[in-house]
Regions:
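C-terminal active-site subregion of NodB/CE4 polysaccharide deacetylases
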Residues: 19-119, 125-132, 136, 200-308
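Short, conserved secondary-structure transition motifs
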Residues: 165-169, 234-236
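Substrate-binding clefts and substrate-entry loops adjacent to catalytic sites
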Residues: 189-200
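Acidic (Asp/Glu)-rich catalytic clusters
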Residues: 55, 109-110, 146-156, 170-190, ...
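A short alpha/beta connector and helix-capping loop motif
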Residues: 129-150, 158-161
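Sec-dependent N-terminal signal peptides
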Residues: 1-16
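Generic enzyme active-site microenvironment
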Residues: 119, 162, 189
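Short amphipathic alpha-helical segments and helix-helix/interface helices
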Residues: 83-86, 142-150, 175-182, 242-248, ...
Length: 308
């Protein structure tokens, strides 16, 4: 559902409903989104990103990364190639949103922008590390992305990080790192406790795997109704468990669940969209990875979601 606002070019301050996507156009060039001091709920003014026609039924790129490191492995993406991915996405008109913003159809985008949902699985240390001086390791995913955002402020570190108990290592710094990444605009999600194939487990094991990780993340201030990512994209036999269940006298709910396949996802406005079963594509150069899909996009063989 889209919410159209008529407003004067300068100074309009209208109340918005948080769950409705809101778009406004700046006068020219990039203008960092700001809220009025007098009215903190005012409309955000965002620049036009491209002259493409609106297409709110188009495909959404939900990209899945694991390791930021060198190596011939589909789960690896080198630091230089990840940096190039960000550049390619930016130049193609993509701007980042979280999984929750996507599935709830409340993506705040400038006109002509396409949403990209950047996700990271497994919480590997090469995704986010702090150095002894407290600075972010520039060779990690967060380091590369945050550096990119300095010259591209409309492409902030806003993604979804599906966590395992390792939580990027550096246990003594865990709380600090969670706070930092949330302040950047990202969110954390549940990738289960032991990364098991849920399709091979009975209901009790599935509940335990999901609940234990949920409980751990809640201790760090993550909302209990968080996104879920079943390991390997394998759903439990009882698929209702990815939505909600009761375990040891407590009820658990998740706001979404994703697959781990090789194609762009449906728009949240598509009648077939299911927020508990949306697709992702690999952040790699292998068959059906991000390089493949960006090439198809350039060739006009895939029609992306474009904000009005």
């Amino acid at each position: 559902m889209f919410f159209s606002l008529a407003f004067a070019l300068f100074g309009f301050q209208g109340q918005i409903t948080p769950k409705l996507p809101v778009r406004a156009q700046a006068v020219s060039g990039f203008q960092k989104p700001q809220r009025s001091k007098q009215n903190p709920n005012s409309v955000w003014f965002l620049p036009r990103v491209s002259n493409r026609s609106a297409n709110t039924k188009g495909k959404v790129f939900v990209i899945m990364y694991h390791h930021i490191r060198e190596g011939a492995n589909p789960m690896f993406r080198s630091a230089s190639k990840f940096r190039q991915d960000l550049e390619n996405l930016y130049n193609a008109g993509f701007r980042p949103v979280t999984v929750t913003e996507y599935v709830e159809n409340r993506m705040i985008l400038g006109p002509g922008a396409s949403p990209v949902v950047i996700t990271f699985d497994d919480a590997h240390p090469n995704q986010f590390q702090l150095r002894k001086d407290g600075s972010i390791d520039p060779h990690t995913a967060v380091g590369i992305w945050s550096e990119f955002s300095k010259t591209h402020p409309d492409f902030p570190v806003k993604g979804t990080w599906y966590m395992l108990p390792v939580m990027w290592g550096q246990k003594a710094l865990r709380e600090k790192k969670v706070k930092m990444i949330l302040e950047m605009g990202s969110e954390l999600g549940n990738h289960t406790y032991n990364h098991k194939f849920l399709s091979k487990q009975n209901d009790e094991v599935v509940k335990s795997e999901i609940a234990k990780m949920n409980d751990l993340l809640v201790k760090y201030g993550i909302p209990a109704n968080m996104p879920l990512c079943p390991p390997y994209g394998e759903y439990p036999k009882n698929k209702s468990l990815v939505k909600s269940f009761s375990w040891k006298g407590k009820t658990y709910n998740h706001s979404s669940a994703c697959l781990a396949w090789d194609a762009p996802a449906l728009s949240p406005e598509d009648s077939k969209f299911n927020k508990y079963k949306f697709e992702r594509l690999h952040g790699n150069s292998y068959s059906m990875g991000i390089d493949y899909w960006l090439a198809r996009l350039k060739a006009g063989k895939v029609k992306p979601y474009v904000s009005p």
